[in-house]
């Protein structure tokens, strides 16, 4: 039985990945922080695809709630979680002059600490590798961390966020080493996919045009990358950036 937990699954990329996983035969636990109505819609669409789901509210800046989330998901879906998507994220502007202790803690907490705690919980389930038709180990677990193309193209803006995502990229590789062969760990580094809350349509359209390929990213690009990770048992510790080549800008 395939069971997934997607954090921040009520809206945007999280919703798209949750629905994609349901389409691939996963029962999906839908995590949300405050967007209950959106999460309920995601859950309803998962049920419409014939899969089980559960709505799970948790503040991922709260250590106890974060530690409890994956075990709650496993209990709700009736067995171990085999796919964890660490998608929930805080993305707020700061720089070397404006960053505060609070902005630092919020970004590190949501983008690095919470994924680490959830990864520990995934590991604690005791998943074991199976054997494929070559009698070689095949991982039964997959963790996908939503990172950001900017870790390959650093700028001094969004500093706390960027540092947290750099940590998540390092964590992706080190946990891939630590959890093999039972669990694979990979990252997706999106480029301009959906208009930001504080962006105008014109600014977002220009951001998409400014990539190397002169095009942005669609939700299908993100879910295709997730699908590749599901289907590629020899891939771990990798970052794929569906970003129109934004990370190559100079």
Predicted region positions:
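Conserved glycine-rich cofactor-binding loop
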Residues: 10-12
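C-terminal substrate-recognition "lid" of short-chain dehydrogenase/reductases
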Residues: 218-242, 247-248
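Substrate-binding pocket helix/loop in short-chain dehydrogenase/reductase
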Residues: 95-96, 100-108, 207
